[in-house]
Amino acid sequence: DGKLCLVKGQGEETWALPGGFGEVGYSPTENILKEIQEETGYSARVIRLLAVFDTNRYQLQSRQYVKLVFECELLDGNFEKNQEISDLAFFEREKIPALSTKRNTEEQLNFLWEVYDGKRDLYCD
């Protein structure tokens, strides 16, 4: 429905896209579906890859990571607080709360909206 699912980590005041590290032996699609289930309690369907981000482009880290961001449709389930996530909410693009900039930046979300709206193809750093 065009709203963005964001989560708040335990002990954090800011929000981020759900996600996590990919595990060996899983495809990117399998990994994101696993992470969505673990973090949100929802089952989902991957629609398409929206972006590939180089984490060092946005915040220099001791290790370089590549983030794959997918558009997904949540199918069913219920959110319950867990050891990683304290809250989950769906936001309209004009009402995005303060972001956990170590995980997602406003610039990255703007790229995602451009792809979602069909204003550009897949975004890749």
Identify the residue ranges that each predicted region occupies.
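Conserved hydrophobic/aromatic beta-strand scaffold that supports enzyme active sites
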Residues: 6, 69-71, 90
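N-terminal strand-loop-strand
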Residues: 1-17, 44, 48
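Residues that recognize and position ribonucleotide moieties
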Residues: 15, 42, 63, 68, ...
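The catalytic Nudix box helix
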Residues: 17-50, 70
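Nudix hydrolase/Nudix homology domain
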Residues: 14, 83-125
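Nucleotide phosphate-binding site architecture
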Residues: 5, 23, 97
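Active-site-adjacent beta-strand/loop module that shapes the phosphate/pyrophosphate-binding cleft
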Residues: 53-78, 112, 116
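Short loop segments at secondary-structure junctions
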Residues: 1-3, 73-78, 93-95
